[in-house]
Amino acid sequence: MARQTRQRILDASLSMFNTQGEPNVTTNHIADELEISPGNLYYHFRNKDDIIEQFFGGYEQRMDAALTAPSGRLPELEDVWLQLHLVFECIWDYRFLYRDLVDILSRNRRLRMRFARILKRADEQAHKVMRGLAQAGIMRASAPEVDAAATNILVIATFWLNYAAARGDKDERASIRDGIVQVMMLIAPFLRDAERVHLNTLTRAYLD
């Protein structure tokens, strides 16, 4: 029973954080939503940051898996697309972390350090994939262009939801889809003609 209550708290908290924004949700709101006493909630979690750290652990596992590139061969466009899809799916499921990123990290040093590690790994992976595409002959780009493209990919992926919210987008799933396409379009100018046609085909299939 206690385990079920703990999971119900996590499920309700994640839904409320994602839909209402983490700063707007208190532990009392969560307890009211579940029709349990605040004391019952505190039996399982010391405070709201304790709940957030539980989510961050799941986010880290998902993101680490998404950032794992194919081994033993050079990347292809499909690899980039799949990796972006997994990354943006993770961002969608834990979107409150990104939408309220500055507020959450400003008050929790542990999460700030852990998020910095994720960003560092994502940066390294983006550079590795871009260099792999260039090495495979899929991209024609100088070393500075490859590095700039990798950095731009990371910036857009990290802050796309914030940008979409600022411009008033209501459909966050569509915003995620648009973010993936936007990232892929950063690569398009550097692709060979045949690969650019292939990318356009992938994009149309994804948007349909």
Annotate the PLM regions.
Residues T68-D93:
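Hydrophobic alpha-helical connector segments
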Residues T5, I9-A12, A149:
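N-terminal positioning helix adjacent to the helix-turn-helix/winged-helix DNA-binding module
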Residues R110-A136, D147-N162, D178-P189:
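Amphipathic alpha-helical packing segments from all-alpha helical-bundle domains
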Residues R99-L101, M113-R114, S142, L199-N200:
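Short, hydrophobic secondary-structure boundary micro-motifs
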Residues N162, A166-D208:
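C-terminal peripheral helix-coil segments that are non-catalytic and often amphipathic
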